């Protein structure tokens, strides 16, 4: 497979001069409404001769704009792309006024919204297969969606999926009941301990990326758009990730019938790789589908924001999986 990954040295220029123009010609924005006054922002990019459709489920505090490079690769290789922005993110509806705070009342809302977007994509393109790509939080949401509608998807790529989050210096065994207690005390819509509003001070060295140019490209966009400045979790969000984890590990894995390609970062400080291992083994043991798991060297949590050679191998695996 040819070397098609955008080079780090000229990344920003190529994105601005080539990728953004290419995608703008193929871009359509629309909104889905499942509930009154709750609009889910979605964006669609059409391939010239589509052989499949990919729906992207983004991660915590992210937006569709963070995925322009992955979208470009999908579209250039013949896949339409649909990308909704999850509740509380970007241009989609929110349940709190603070633009920095990520809050969700029930994790099922994420899953139902994603499935609504997936159904819209399938209805628009019924003759070609639908695939799911989920990163981090979006990977956990994607896994739950797969368990509920296995017939909808031909395959799924889970990149550093959040089966269970990591909670820094506080062990998960402590953070989980603490989040539940804080919610019971009426603090569901408050920042988790240590969380704060967006201040624009995130450093590359502390980020989930190993590509400085890719990190800087999105941070520039984020710094000028308040709707892109989600920054920290609420107690309610953390409590719901615990509920999602419990569902995936107790029931969800039993219902997955879609072929899976799971990528794991070498140095992931945001989600538990051990939890990914347990989840993958459960799905594999159930015997209903294939599971391929790849640990990627020289990567942090955002594998899709890695250096050139890592990305070339990463995208080769993804495109081969979709073709199979």
What are these regions (language model features)?
Residues 1-33, 40-45:
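An N-terminal hydrophobic leader/cap segment in hydrolases
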Residues 64, 71-97:
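Conserved alpha/beta-hydrolase
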Residues 51, 59-62:
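Active-site glycine-rich loops that stabilize anionic/oxyanionic intermediates
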Residues 290-324:
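Catalytic active-site module of serine/aspartate enzymes centered on a nucleophile-bearing elbow/loop
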Residues 258, 272-282:
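Short alpha-helix in the alpha/beta-hydrolase fold that links the catalytic acid
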Residues 102-122:
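Alpha/beta-hydrolase active-site loop
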Residues 256, 262-264, 268:
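Short beta-strand/loop motif that positions the catalytic acidic residue
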């Amino acid at each position: 497979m040819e070397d098609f990954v955008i080079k780090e040295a000229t990344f920003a220029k190529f994105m601005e001069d080539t990728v953004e123009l290419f995608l703008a010609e193929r871009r359509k924005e629309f909104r889905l409404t499942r509930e009154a006054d709750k609009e889910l922002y979605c964006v669609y990019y059409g391939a010239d001769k589509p052989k499949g459709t990919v729906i992207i489920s983004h991660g915590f505090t992210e937006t569709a704009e963070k995925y322009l490079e992955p979208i470009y690769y999908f579209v250039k290789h013949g896949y339409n792309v649909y990308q909704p922005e999850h509740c509380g993110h970007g241009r989609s509806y929110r349940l709190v006024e603070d633009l920095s705070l990520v809050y969700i009342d029930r994790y099922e809302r994420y899953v139902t919204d994603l499935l609504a977007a997936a159904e819209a994509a399938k209805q628009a393109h019924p003759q070609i297969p639908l695939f799911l790509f989920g990163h981090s939080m979006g990977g956990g949401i994607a896994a739950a969606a797969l368990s509920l509608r296995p017939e909808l998807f031909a395959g799924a790529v889970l990149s550093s999926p959040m089966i269970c989050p990591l909670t820094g210096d506080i062990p998960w065994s402590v953070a989980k009941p603490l989040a539940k207690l804080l919610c019971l005390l009426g603090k569901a819509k408050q920042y988790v301990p240590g969380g704060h509003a967006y201040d624009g001070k995130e450093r590359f060295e502390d980020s989930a990326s190993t590509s400085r140019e890719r990190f800087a490209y999105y941070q520039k966009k984020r710094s000028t758009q308040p709707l892109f400045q989600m920054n920290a979790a609420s107690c309610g969000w953390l409590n719901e990730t615990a509920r999602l984890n419990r569902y995936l590990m107790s029931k969800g894995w039993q219902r997955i019938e879609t072929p899976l390609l799971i990528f794991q970062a070498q140095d992931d400080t945001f989600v538990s790789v051990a939890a990914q291992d347990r989840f993958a083994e459960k799905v594999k043991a159930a015997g209903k589908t294939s599971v391929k798991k790849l640990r990627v060297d020289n990567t942090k949590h955002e594998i899709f924001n890695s250096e050139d050679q890592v990305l070339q191998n990463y995208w080769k695996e993804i495109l081969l999986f979709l073709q199979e």
